[in-house]
Amino acid sequence: PETAQENIREIGPHVMFAPPRLYEGLTRQVQVKYIDATWIKRKIYELGTRIGYKVANLEFEKEPVPAHLKLLNGIGHLLMQKKLKDHLGMSRIRHAYTGGAAMGPDHFRFFHALDVNLKQIYGQTEIAGISVVHRDGDVKFDTVGTPIPETEVKITEDGEIISKSPSVFLGYYKNEEASKETLVDGWLYSGDKGFIDEDGHLVVFDRSKDVMTLSDGRPFSPQYLETRLKFSPYISEAWVIGDKRDYVTAVMCIDYSVVGKWADEKK
């Protein structure tokens, strides 16, 4: 794990699958280097990413990208994106996937702004791995995609994600009780909370056991909020609490090296 980012750069893969933690680490690496960069490099980065975000947002909304933005994005690719992607080991990436845990939309949008074709997948071992995935041209930064062929996905009354397909397992070995809890009438109960949006995309909220509820009954996902907070290069860790309380509270650990450099510059 310590050399994963270095290994990716050496290999230069065309297809990559990695957990959100690795992609988040790459994002943080870029943000820290941005803070250490010269004034001119920071301005080039800011301009390139600003244009990249505009193009990515239009593509997310399935709207045409104006010719002038395509031209500017091409210039940004030559001046900034190409070198940055090479540094991250993503210069040859055609398809990048992530899954296994929630990924913050900020990180997801960041890679699409760099023209990295990152897609999310959702599934579990009991359904042979993948049941839902983003398709090219149908990517939304806050979802995990749509079901693969011959797979049905529904949401129960209490918000749990359930799936049915020919690849659903028959049960746990010598554990009939657990099998009965997980498999009901051919439907696989995931233990995850979520919903299906108007475009048929699945939105995963969090593990049911990890979802907390405010005193007024409103649910929230601590992991989702923690991931959003840690998108900042100044925050190394975040811990969100608020179950049965009137409001949500976040306890944060700052990144001393990054904050220290910022403080020196602001003297």
Segments from the language model and where they lie:
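C-terminal boundary motif of the adenylate-forming
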Residues: 193, 232-258
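ATP-dependent adenylate-forming carboxylate-activation enzymes
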Residues: 1-11, 17, 36-40, 220-225
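Short, charged/polar, Gly/Pro-enriched secondary-structure boundary elements
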Residues: 139-140, 256-261
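Short secondary-structure boundary segments
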Residues: 20
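Gly/Ser/Thr-rich phosphate-binding loop
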Residues: 14-17, 29-139, 152, 235-236
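Adenylate-forming
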Residues: 168, 183, 201-230, 259-267
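Conserved ATP-binding/catalytic segment of the ANL
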Residues: 147-214
